[in-house]
Amino acid sequence: QKTTAPLSVSLIQGNIPQDLKWLTEYQGKTLSIYADLTRSEWGRDLIVWPESSIPMFQTDIQPFLAAMQQQAQNTGSAWVTGIPYWDLAESQRQQPSMFYNTIMASGSAASGLYKKQRLVPFGEYIPLSGLLSWVLPALQNDPSMSGFSRGASDQTPLKVHQHHLGAAICYEVAYPNLTRRNAS
């Protein structure tokens, strides 16, 4: 029997329409909606934003991430969010660039990055994309359609205060062995 203190948790849902979520001109509004909804929740042990609530790569939004991480740190909160992640170190070692659908933990006593292992066909990757590239050449240049990579099966759990969190993104919860492994 493990004994750890309970966590006070806030789940934030911005209800951003899918047809607007990834539009460049709507990204600032999306971030404002989530930041506004979170404002009164700082001070909770854990604040959770949903999958891809930040609709841009971490490399393109460093000032926003730094501000959110600082707010979490200042209030003693851990902040967990969904964000597409461009792994620059991996991309320098191999081609093509490595993009992931991820969950990132940061803030007070929080750390970790989980890279989704079970990708949605035709949503996060195109099956047989090498064979289809001559039919759909635009797919090769669109990371939101064909560029997501699978995360490794042996990832370290996210850490939030004294807790280790098993992660699952989207339909990964339909794979009980994966979910169980991620939680151990």
Give, region by region, the residue ranges found by the protein language model.
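Enzyme catalytic cores with a strong preference for nitrogen-chemistry domains
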Residues: 1-184
